[in-house]
Amino acid sequence: MFSSVKSKVIHVEPVIYDLVLEPFKVHILGCGSALPTLKHSASAQIIEMRGKCFMMDCGEGAQMQFRRTHVHFAKINAIFISHLHGDHCFGLLGLLSTLGMLGRTAKLKVYAPESYGDLFKRQIDFFMQGMEYEIEFVPVDTEKAQVVYEDHSVTVETIPLQHRVPCCGYIFREKPTLPHIRRDMIDYYEIPVSQINNIKNGADWTTKEGDVIPNARLVMPAVSPRSYAYCSDTRFVPGLAEKVKRSEEHTSELQSP
């Protein structure tokens, strides 16, 4: 369903450029309800974007689904938990243990409702003795929309939801990138490499003859950033549709009355 993103081709005269987008994939490892079925595993997803790999919820059976989708355990950069019902988090400790047995050394952050903090620490202290990587618990205020993760290319923002327990969704967003340089214009006007970043950031270019070349002639617009919204179990939330409508894709799990 969300397994791949096609390259977008932008035509600029007189040269044709093919701008290949970085992969943006969502792997649905599980989408079943609280009761197990033979067709669907419990809730778990992997979001691949900008060279990173984020896990969204971790129900039972997630590790087996990793194997089936050929996503490598070692690629996980961070784990996000929407709420503390078992079908969304009972697979977490097993996965963390497996990562340790596979020799992970990189630090891993787990974002989850703040009420899980004390229990999570006790579970890690009891079950994860001797593991050679650090696990950091990051408490999430499920009642507040806020950016909980940010790096140079991606942000993750919470979406307050309404469920029987504290619960939030997450929006994974790409950050805008700089415009793309037109190589034919750079060559034609003999612009030195040292000026490329200035031009990407909006500078015009003045030729040896004193002519000012507008920036718009030297660059192509950047590809629009993409986003993905994950809304787990929730009742009707006024304004929720407005918050996620700008996302290219989204997943929602609705709670029956």
Give the location of each predicted region:
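Metal-dependent phosphodiesterase/nuclease catalytic metal-binding core
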Residues: 2, 6-7, 12, 16-20, ...
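Conserved beta-strand hairpin/beta-sheet module of binuclear metal-dependent hydrolase folds
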Residues: 12-69, 105-107, 170-172, 221-230
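Generic structural signal for residues in well-ordered beta-strands
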Residues: 26, 135-137, 156
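Active-site metal-binding loops of divalent metal-dependent hydrolases
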Residues: 31-32, 61, 84, 115, ...
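Active-site metal-binding motif and surrounding structural segment of the metallo-beta-lactamase
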Residues: 60-111, 139-141
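Structured loop/turn residues at beta-strand edges in well-structured enzyme cores
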Residues: 71-74, 133, 152-154, 245
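Active-site neighborhood of divalent metal-dependent phosphoester bond hydrolases
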Residues: 104-108, 113-141
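Short "domain-exit" segments at the C-terminal end of structured domains
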Residues: 253-257
